[in-house]
Amino acid sequence: MKIVVLTLFDDFVRSYYDFSIIKNALDKKAVELEVINFRQYANDKHKTVDDTIYGGSAGMLLKLEPLVNCLRDIKQNQFKDPNKIRTYLLSPQGEVYDQNKAVALSQSDHDLILIAGRYEGFDERIYHYVDGALSVGDFVITGGELAALIVVDSIVRLLPNVINKDSLSSESFNNYLLDYPMYTKPYDFEGYKVPDVLLSGNHQAIAAFNQQEAINNTKMKRPDLYLKYKSNLK
């Protein structure tokens, strides 16, 4: 899989790729990641990427030309199959991104282009040139770079040979459940003790205990997810 992030702050995005799981995935050649500053595709001598908004609204809006020029160029010249690419804006107006979407994208045979917005966002006509938009939540951040990195990270860690399969199967949101509570040494800290079953050595009992704790944890902390879990059992 190849994932390209289009941004005005390429150094910021690229710096994240030097750490942890993303770096391991790159070292293993499990994924190809590229970052492109779309300012270079602006037509004027000042490399202008934003302009005022029709109708008098406050702020500046990203111009269409640099983004569309960039998309056309990289789709033709930087991917193996131009017909197997999905392109998404990162926008609070997009489809809410969740673990199910991450799994679907990680298992797709399509490469990915993510466009990080800035200022007041995108000229509405950009939707004619992309497959959709993704939102990482109902809040506003300064730019789409952090959102793009969330999407990249969540996909890459699901790709083959990046993370141990057993670790993935027990993570939060698997089957709509949060992770079960976990403990480390010391056994007793100021009267708060580790549940004795976890020290029993009985793997079947431990698995059953952890499963029930995951259910209880989800019901208490995320009742919305718990309802999805219950519905999924039917």
Swiss-Prot record:
UniProt subcellular location: Cytoplasm
EC number: 2.1.1.228
Keyword terms of this UniProt record: Cytoplasm, Methyltransferase, S-adenosyl-L-methionine, Transferase, tRNA processing
A GO cellular component entry from the record: cytosol
Catalytic reactions on record: guanosine(37) in tRNA + S-adenosyl-L-methionine = N(1)-methylguanosine(37) in tRNA + S-adenosyl-L-homocysteine + H(+)
Binding locations of S-adenosyl-L-methionine: G117, V136, G137, D138, F139, V140, I141
GO MF terms held by the record: tRNA (guanine(37)-N1)-methyltransferase activity
Record's subunit section: Homodimer.
GO annotation terms (biological process): tRNA N1-guanine methylation
Protein family: Belongs to the RNA methyltransferase TrmD family.
Function: Specifically methylates guanosine-37 in various tRNAs.
Transmembrane regions: none
Record-given protein name: tRNA (guanine-N(1)-)-methyltransferase
